[in-house]
Amino acid sequence: MSYGPLDMYRNPGPSGPQPRDFNSIIQTCSGNIQRISQATAQIKNLMSQLGTKQDSSKLQENLQQLQHSTNQLAKETNELLKELGSLPLPLSASEQRQQKLQKERLMNDFSSALNNFQVVQRKVSEKEKESIARARAGSRLSAEDRQREEQLVSFDSHEEWNQMQSQEEEAAITEQDLELIKERETAIRQLEADILDVNQIFKDLAMMIHDQGDLIDSIEANVESSEVHVERATDQLQRAAYYQKKSRKKMCILVLVLSVIVTVLVVVIWVASK
């Protein structure tokens, strides 16, 4: 039975060094988030087959690989978001706002995809643990049972000898079952380690969202401060123009008064000379 390709959810490695600019990181993160969501949907589909007739070692192997590769994709996206936060901001305040909004939207999408993935991870872990519990409970012979029955065995009849051989066959089957149980327990430990990784990613994401909010507040404060400075400069220019106009008016009055005084003096001198 085919369970779908696993490589489609892995981020294809670049053939060479890629430019780490804002837009390329945004694009890579968006693609990763989409793949995480797609992988989560397929994990749910595989999980629904656990404990049914479709359950098999191949299904569990695919489920484990898909879950682990998705976890690695989430860790890669987390590192890219950290790198995104370390890029220098553009000079334009409007471009700064636009980039902040893009990052905020991206982190919200990542948080949502990550939350859905972790919910499915926990459900897979619960199902695997239930499966192991059923397998242990259904084991035909425990080690203590075999030891006790071997002590009670008597070879007085051919029939009892056949019964002992049958028990040994059952014990061999049980050993095989126990080996499968050990494999599942190993897979569960890996799954729980991946769940802890996702928990750490959530902590990092919460910190980045907090820093993002502080940065947006800082940008808005700078924009408001610039607007205040512009308003103050405009007010000062208006005042300067007012004072300059007032000064010119005073100058005109002074010139007019001086003109009148000079005229009066000229008239007085002219009259006196006669």
Curated annotation (Swiss-Prot):
Q: What is this protein called?
A: Syntaxin-12
Q: Which residues carry this modification: Phosphoserine?
A: S139, S142, S218, S225
A GO biological process of this protein is:
endocytic recycling
What membrane topology is given?
Answer: Single-pass type IV membrane protein
Q: How does it assemble?
A: Associates with the BLOC-1 complex. Interacts with BLOC1S6. Interacts with NAPA and SNAP23. Identified in a complex containing STX6, STX12, VAMP4 and VTI1A. Interacts with GRIPAP1. Forms a complex with GRIP1, GRIA2 and NSG1; controls the intracellular fate of AMPAR and the endosomal sorting of the GRIA2 subunit toward recycling and membrane targeting. Interacts with NSG1. Interacts with TPC1. Interacts (via N-terminus) with VPS13B.
Gene name for this UniProt entry: Stx12
Supply the alphabetized keyword list.
Acetylation, Coiled coil, Endosome, Golgi apparatus, Membrane, Phosphoprotein, Protein transport, Transmembrane, Transmembrane helix, Transport
Similarity comment: family membership: Belongs to the syntaxin family.
Enumerate the residue ranges of region (Disordered): 1-20, 128-147
Q: What does this gene product do?
A: SNARE promoting fusion of transport vesicles with target membranes. Together with SNARE STX6, promotes movement of vesicles from endosomes to the cell membrane, and may therefore function in the endocytic recycling pathway. Through complex formation with GRIP1, GRIA2 and NSG1 controls the intracellular fate of AMPAR and the endosomal sorting of the GRIA2 subunit toward recycling and membrane targeting.
Q: Which PANTHER family does the entry link to? A: SYNTAXIN (PTHR19957), SYNTAXIN-12 (PTHR19957:SF88)
SMART domains xref list = SynN, t_SNARE
What are the t-SNARE coiled-coil homology domain coordinates in residue numbering?
178-240
Instruction: Give the organism, scientific name.
Output: Mus musculus
